[in-house]
Amino acid sequence: MDLTPREKDKLLLFTAALVAERRKARGLKLNHPEAIALISAAILEGARDGRTVAELMNYGRTILTRDEVMDGIPEMIPDVQIEATFPDGTKLVTVHQPII
């Protein structure tokens, strides 16, 4: 299986998101990389489902709450930016203050 560097990055991101999802389901608080991975993967999947950039910017703020991450993590993540593929091309989605 030959993967491009972009495809390898997406695969790594989704693997990290799966780990984060499982830890969250067990009641563990997520750390910085886990929180970023979970939010990013949800944005990518939302784009694949046909949501708009504006919808994803709002949706990105609903994925995690302050209670689901370790202390100080919300302040460490002022925004999350991810390039997502939409039907009309690749666009940068920015989620400001993703953990409230």
Swiss-Prot record:
Pfam families from the UniProt entry: Urease_gamma
What Gene3D superfamilies does this protein's entry cite?
Answer: Urease, gamma-like subunit
State the GO CC annotations: cytoplasm
Q: Where in the cell is it found?
A: Cytoplasm
This protein's pathway reads:
Nitrogen metabolism; urea degradation; CO(2) and NH(3) from urea (urease route): step 1/1
Q: Has UniProt tagged this entry with the keyword Cytoplasm?
A: yes
Molecular function terms in GO for this entry? Answer: nickel cation binding; urease activity
EC code:
3.5.1.5
The membrane spanning regions, by residue number, are none
Q: Which UniProt keywords apply?
A: Cytoplasm, Hydrolase
Keyword Cytoplasm in the entry? The reply is yes
Instruction: Name the chemical reaction catalysed here.
Output: urea + 2 H2O + H(+) = hydrogencarbonate + 2 NH4(+)
InterPro entries per the record? Urease_gamma, Urease_gamma/gamma-beta_su, Urease_gamma_sf, Urease_subunit
Output the GO biological process annotations, alphabetical, semicolon-separated: urea catabolic process
Coiled coil residues, start to end: none
How does the record describe its quaternary structure?
Heterotrimer of UreA (gamma), UreB (beta) and UreC (alpha) subunits. Three heterotrimers associate to form the active enzyme.
> What family name appears in the similarity comment?
Belongs to the urease gamma subunit family.
User: What is the protein name for this chain?
Assistant: Urease subunit gamma
Q: Which organism is it from?
A: Tolumonas auensis (strain DSM 9187 / NBRC 110442 / TA 4)
Q: What is the lineage of its organism?
A: Bacteria, Pseudomonadati, Pseudomonadota, Gammaproteobacteria, Aeromonadales
